[in-house]
């Protein structure tokens, strides 16, 4: 997690409340105001989004897993590249788990295309070739 201030976040894909399980011994659930963007999940402890957000950046996340439905709530876990697990829950109808999954997969796809493009451009430079445009 990083702390983001100053610059406004990119375009908002979804905004609303999630509950995050604390890392403390008691593991209490704490409500967070959340903003989902194309680059990550911004968590605010204040409902009015005052102060700095903790950001779970998609470049540091491996996957969303362990989705469970209990009553009207959905429980899910975000797993970092380092293996840390961060637990969340939300109302089933809010579809946070689906929205985060779609945004994370979209981010990973864009990164894979960018890395492939860079690798092809590097190979073309090494071979003295010119590469046709792949789009944006």
From Swiss-Prot:
Domain of life: Eukaryota
Membrane topology note: Peripheral membrane protein
Keywords, in A-Z order: Cytoplasm, Membrane
GO cellular component terms given for this protein: cytoplasm; membrane
Subcellular location: Cytoplasm; Membrane
Molecular function GO terms recorded: phosphatidylinositol phosphate binding
Gene3D superfamilies documented for this protein: Pleckstrin-homology domain (PH domain)/Phosphotyrosine-binding domain (PTB) (2.30.29.30)
Cleavable signal peptide: none
Principal subcellular localisation of the protein: cytoplasm
SMART domains: PH
Coiled coil: none
GO BP field: positive regulation of apoptotic process
Residue span, PH domain: 12-105
InterPro entries with a match to the protein in the record: PH-like_dom_sf, PH_domain, PHLA1/2/3
Annotated function: Plays a role in regulating placenta growth. May act via its PH domain that competes with other PH domain-containing proteins, thereby preventing their binding to membrane lipids.
Family: Belongs to the PHLDA2 family.
UniProt note: domains: The PH domain binds phosphoinositides with a broad specificity. It may compete with the PH domain of some other proteins, thereby interfering with their binding to phosphatidylinositol 4,5-bisphosphate (PIP2) and phosphatidylinositol 3,4,5-trisphosphate (PIP3).
PANTHER family xrefs: PLECKSTRIN HOMOLOGY-LIKE DOMAIN FAMILY A MEMBER 2, PLECKSTRIN HOMOLOGY-LIKE DOMAIN, PQ-RICH PROTEIN
Name of the protein described by the UniProt record: Pleckstrin homology-like domain family A member 2
Species, as recorded: Xenopus tropicalis
Organism classification: Eukaryota, Metazoa, Chordata, Craniata, Vertebrata
């Amino acid at each position: 997690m990083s702390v983001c201030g100053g610059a406004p976040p990119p375009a908002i894909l979804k905004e609303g409340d999630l509950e995050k399980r604390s890392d403390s011994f008691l593991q209490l659930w704490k409500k967070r105001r959340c903003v989902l963007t194309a680059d990550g999940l911004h968590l605010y402890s204040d409902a009015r989004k005052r102060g700095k957000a903790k950001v779970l950046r998609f470049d540091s996340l491996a996957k969303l897993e362990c989705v469970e439905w209990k009553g009207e709530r959905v429980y899910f876990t975000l797993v970092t590249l380092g293996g840390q697990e961060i637990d969340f829950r939300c109302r089933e109808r809010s579809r946070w788990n689906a929205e985060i999954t779609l945004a994370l997969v979209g981010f990973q796809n864009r990164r894979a295309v960018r890395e492939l493009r860079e690798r092809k451009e590097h190979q073309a430079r090494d071979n003295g070739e010119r590469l046709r445009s792949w789009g944006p």
